[in-house]
Regions:
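Conserved Walker B catalytic segment
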Residues: 1-11
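Catalytic "switch" loops of ABC-type ATPases
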Residues: 27
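Conserved catalytic/dimer-interface elements of ABC ATPase nucleotide-binding domains
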Residues: 45
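Short regulatory helix/loop adjacent to the ATP-binding pocket of P-loop NTPases
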Residues: 30-42
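Glycine-rich, phosphate-binding/catalytic loops in enzymes
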Residues: 5, 39-42, 116-118
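Conserved D-loop beta-strand region of ABC ATPase nucleotide-binding domains
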Residues: 24
Length: 322
């Protein structure tokens, strides 16, 4: 590891020589090694050139978590980041942009669409996509703002339902008097009331987005439900659902098929898919991959497209030096 290599090098030097060593790297592995062997962000300098200007951030443990006032929680959050960053997340330091998602479906779809849909204008950039569920992603927000990397946080509206609504799979057609259980939205809105929620939140280089508008008269509570509402008549979506939940699909759509029934049963369907999200994502990816006509691909929900438009603008401005 890095620390042992430096120690060995210094042991072989003359005792009369004071040595300073600077290591520059584009390797997430080397950065990982530094953080984990020293158990610290100290002595790491992050250098970037946004808008053709040098930006240097001298990292140290005291500035990684700044918004948390509880000392114990702050120490635990820092410990979590040091451990968790080992699992691919160190790539964020070398990315042009970052997208945080909360599920395998979002991760799979965004990776495919960014790479394969040139109209999004993002496939020429290195965009790191991290699947970090729920409130755990919040721990990274202070660090992301320090690094000034354009970042999208895609989260879920997570509408709180009554027991009867859960049992009957009642779709939601109004946000009046509704609340959310989502920790990210609660933080940026300053509470759990979503009756007058805005379509997104921006905080410096962070863009937080969620299912803020009704689709086919219903408010989705997850990406899967939003995707179903947006694309209920799309062949690829229907084929993927049939592969994963054939009996549920036939029960809802009927024979002959009435695909409009997917709209009224969107919450029920996303609930039934909740334990099969990896299968659902993989079948979507399969049918997307074999369909060369991109006009036949399902559409990304509007709240995601709006976030990607924001990101494209941010990256274009940085690339042009503005």
């Amino acid at each position: 590891n890095i620390n042992e290599a430096i120690k060995e090098l210094l042991n072989g030097s003359s005792k009369k020589i004071n040595t300073q060593i600077v290591i520059t790297t584009h390797s997430a592995h080397i950065l990982n090694s530094k953080i984990h062997t020293s158990n610290s962000f100290n002595n790491i300098s992050y250098i970037s050139t946004p808008n053709n200007e040098a930006n240097v951030v001298n990292l140290h443990d005291e500035i990684i978590i700044t918004s948390e006032e509880d000392k114990t929680k702050k120490l635990n959050d820092l410990k979590f980041i040091k451990k968790h960053i080992k699992f691919k997340v160190s790539d964020m330091f070398f990315a042009d942009a970052i997208i945080f998602v909360e599920g395998v479906t979002e991760e799979t779809l965004l990776s495919f669409y960014i790479d394969n849909h040139e109209t999004l204008g993002l496939n020429k950039y290195y965009i790191a996509i991290f699947n970090i569920n729920g409130a755990h992603g919040l721990v990274y927000h202070d660090l992301i703002k320090l690094l000034k990397i354009p970042t999208i946080v895609i989260t879920d509206l997570d509408i709180k339902r009554t027991d009867d609504e859960k049992i009957n799979f009642t779709p939601i057609n109004s946000l009046d008097a509704r609340t959310t259980t989502n920790a990210t939205i609660q933080k940026y809105k300053g509470g759990d009331d979503i009756s007058n929620i805005t379509d997104h939140y921006e905080d410096e280089n962070l863009y937080i987005t969620y299912q803020s508008e009704a689709v086919e008269e219903y408010y989705a509570t997850s990406l899967e439900e939003a995707f179903i509402l947006q694309n209920h008549d799309n062949n690829i979506l229907n084929n993927a659902i049939k592969e994963v939940k054939p009996k549920i699909y036939e029960e809802i759509v009927g024979n002959p098929e009435t695909r409009k029934n997917l709209v009224d049963n969107s919450y029920k369907l996303q609930n039934k898919l909740s334990k099969s999200k990896s299968d659902f994502a993989n079948w979507l990816l399969y049918y997307l991959s074999i369909e060369d006509d991109k006009e036949k691909h399902p559409k990304l929900p509007n709240y995601i497209n709006s976030a990607l438009d924001w990101l494209k603008t941010k990256l274009a401005l940085a690339n042009d030096g503005q």
